[in-house]
Every structure is written in C-alpha cells, then in structure tokens.
Design a protein with these regions (language model features):
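Compositionally biased, intrinsically disordered low-complexity segments enriched in polar/Pro/Gly
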Residues: 1-18, 251-256
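Small/polar beta-strand repeat architecture
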Residues: 5-8, 16-153
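Generic short beta-strand segments
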Residues: 50-57, 169-173, 200-204, 225
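Short beta-strand and beta-hairpin "edge-sheet" elements
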Residues: 125-127, 200-253
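Short structured motifs
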Residues: 150-154, 225-228
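Short glycine/proline/serine/threonine-rich loop/turn segments at secondary-structure transition edges
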Residues: 176-192
Length: 256
C-alpha cells in the first residue's frame, strides 16, 4: 500500500484558555437574577463558549444529579457576565443574547457538584510552528554482589515520573480577541485550570468540519510557563509560548 509522508502543512494547534473551568453547588444558584457563583478569579470572558455538567468531585468524572432548569448538559452557552472578585456568572443560549432563564437550583448531593468548562478546543490562527517533547525518568536499582561472568554487568532501572515540554509560535494580528493574544495573558493566570492543547499532526476535514476520527493528534491539560514576544522592523510580530503537560497526554494516531 502506498504511503504519504506528512509535512508541516498537515498540522495545527488548538487551545482551551486557562482559568475557564469552575464548579458550583445548588446553593450558588440564584433564581430571578439567573446567576451562578463559581470560583473567584477565573479567566472567563464575555463571549466564551461553555458547557455545563454534573461531576463527582471525589473522582473528577461524571456525577449524579440534575442541572438547574434552563441548562442542559452538552449544550453550548455563551458567557455574558463573569465578575472575577465575586465569581458571579451569567450565560446566554446565543452569543450576545439575554441571560438563560433559570427556574430551579438543580440537584447535586455531595460529592456531586456542577461544573462549567470551556466548550471545546479552538483553532489558534497564524501559528507558524509547534513542538512537543516527552520523557520519562528512570530510577537506578542496580545491586552489587552478583557472580562475575564474561561480560560486565549492566545497571537495572525502574520507571520514575514522566514529564514533557512544548512551545508554539504564532504571528500577532490586530484582532483583540485572538487566542494567540489570550495565551500570552494566560501565562500569568494564577488558576490555569481548564488550559489545554490539542496538537494535530494530521488534521483532516470531513463534510466541512475537522474529523477527529480521521485526524491524528496529541491532547492534554496544560500549564503555560512563559511567553516571549519580539518586534523588529524587518519581521512579522510573533510570540512564542512555552508550556508543559499537566497530566498524561492522550495520543490519537489511529484514523479510526
């Protein structure tokens, strides 16, 4: 079977902004003002697409309960108000629309709670390159006292911790709301929960949209560690953002 080597034109970088995941309980929902109180000093911004779910706080997985009436799991809503100092959040069913009418506070008995999170990875435009490296540490467990033989003995190791690092370079534009601009700000975000990258090695479209079934990618929650900007009269303005995985990456290299 003939094979085709991939080039950089097959790749892409998608991102979820930092500080865009928060939790709240039934007592944090106010009927009448359509307000939910999540954590303070997150990084939710007006226009951000978000989804709601019920999670088990002890595992981080799916929980048992019912979202406040007016909100549906799997539906994309849009932030119309978030006050960092109080954590007050309002959302609408459409970008720039009016607040969703919340008619009850839902049900979520401990350890269950409600979660709001950025809806999906989004394409970062004007990216010129990205790189990602992973490694594993090894712990030396070599022992002495073995019988000598013809050859020198070899050391023995067991697995230690994994780690990784990456970077992405994007050209700056005059679009205030571009994700490349937001990545710079996210470096200094104290609570980076929600930040994540999806690094496509082979992005494939089907029916006019990206098909993750046919594409190949690496995805992970991330911590942004630094950003470097450069401005010269001879080159396009660019920013390089450095990051590391905050958990085990998911490798999807199978087109099925």
């Amino acid at each position: 079977m003939a094979v085709t080597c991939l080039s950089g034109t097959s790749g892409a970088l998608y991102y979820k902004p930092a500080g865009t995941t928060g939790t709240f309980g039934t007592g944090d929902v106010t009927i009448g003002t359509e307000t939910m109180v999540v954590e303070t000093y997150l990084n939710l911004k007006a226009g951000d697409p978000v989804k709601f779910s019920v999670i088990d706080s002890s595992t981080g997985g799916s929980g048992t309960g019912t979202l406040p009436a007016g909100l549906s799991a799997g539906t994309t809503y849009y932030v119309i108000l978030y006050t960092a100092t109080t954590g007050a959040l309002k959302v609408s069913a459409s970008a720039g629309g009016s607040a969703v009418d919340i008619t009850d506070t839902g049900t979520a008995a401990a350890p269950n709670e409600f979660q709001v999170a950025y809806a999906a990875f989004e394409n970062v435009g004007q990216v010129s390159e990205w790189s990602f490296e992973i490694e594993r540490a090894e712990i030396d467990v070599t022992t002495i006292g073995g019988d000598p033989g013809q050859y020198v003995p070899f050391r023995k190791y067991i697995a230690g911790f994994g780690d990784g690092s990456g970077s992405a370079t994007a050209y700056m534009t005059n679009e205030d709301a571009s994700l490349s601009n937001r990545m710079i700000e996210d470096v200094l975000q104290r609570q980076q929960v929600g930040a994540g990258f999806k690094l496509y090695t082979d992005r494939v479209y089907s029916g006019g949209t990206v098909s993750d079934t046919l594409s190949r990618s690496i995805s992970f929650d991330a911590t942004l560690t630094s950003a470097s900007l450069g401005v010269t009269p001879d080159d396009a303005q660019a920013v390089t953002v450095n990051f590391r995985p905050a958990g085990v990456p998911t490798f999807d290299f199978s087109r099925s």
